Amino acid sequence: MALLQWMLENISDDNSIKMSLEEQHETFQINVKWLKFLNLSDSDIVQLQNVYKLVQRDRERLIIYPDPQNVHSWSYLCSPEEIKVIIVGQDPYPDGRGHGLAFSTVRGCSPPNSLKTIFAELERTIENFKAPAHGSLKSWCAQGVLLLNTVFTVIRGVPMSHEAIGWQVLSNRIINQLSEKMQNLVFMLWGSQARKLVSLIDSKKHLILECAHPSPRTKGSKTPFIGCGHFLKANKYLQIHNKCPIDWNITNDL
């Protein structure tokens, strides 16, 4: 309630604001190709401006992850028309290891526990997969895997601290537009937060894969991550629809 009151008192709600794609790019630092694809409404733009004001307010007094230049790095590593698989995460790692890609870390950082679980499932199902010592998943992005958090920033040391500031206006739009405009995509929804997005996806056009979050804290779930087989299922679906499967092995050249 305190956050909502602050927003009402300090942030303009001028729905008459018009922004060109170039202005949106300068303001939000999202790739222009994605901005064209998303076709944000005036209302979306105003809400995003409000989110950015809140993030900037926090940056002035706290440490916020990731750095501004990496908040939307997802939009620069694969174009909308290249997307084949969408893996939905929650929010950035609160220890600074992230770089704007769900579950991925900067090179030189060891994989967090959730990513170790992901690697364990890959080792279980993908022939010759070997877990790397680092946690960068950029090589997946180069093949059309969108690693998308539903919340794009976080206060250092406080997981989900920016969950309530409004980032979902963007992440929901991304999911919705991919579902509407594309065909035969694979959506991997891991955990309760990601599974809330299922209503935004047309199951007649796309494959939706759901299971527990790979965090060790979800051990014992009715739909555990280990054993989900999502990576194999995704590749089989892509091949059925005449798309190249994903090479899930983590390369060392990115």
UniProtKB/Swiss-Prot annotation:
It is found in: Host nucleus. PROSITE patterns: U_DNA_GLYCOSYLASE. It holds the Pfam family UDG. Keywords: DNA damage, DNA repair, Host nucleus, Hydrolase. GO terms for molecular function: uracil DNA N-glycosylase activity. It catalyses: Hydrolyzes single-stranded DNA or mismatched double-stranded DNA and polynucleotides, releasing free uracil. The active site is at D91 (proton acceptor). Its EC number is 3.2.2.27. One of its GO terms (biological process) is base-excision repair, AP site formation via deaminated base removal. One of its GO terms (cellular component) is host cell nucleus. Excises uracil residues from the DNA which can arise as a result of misincorporation of dUMP residues by DNA polymerase or deamination of cytosines. Therefore may reduce deleterious uracil incorporation into the viral genome, particularly in terminally differentiated cells which lack DNA repair enzymes. PANTHER family: URACIL-DNA GLYCOSYLASE. Belongs to the uracil-DNA glycosylase (UDG) superfamily. UNG family. This is Uracil-DNA glycosylase. It comes from Human herpesvirus 7 (strain JI). The gene is U81.
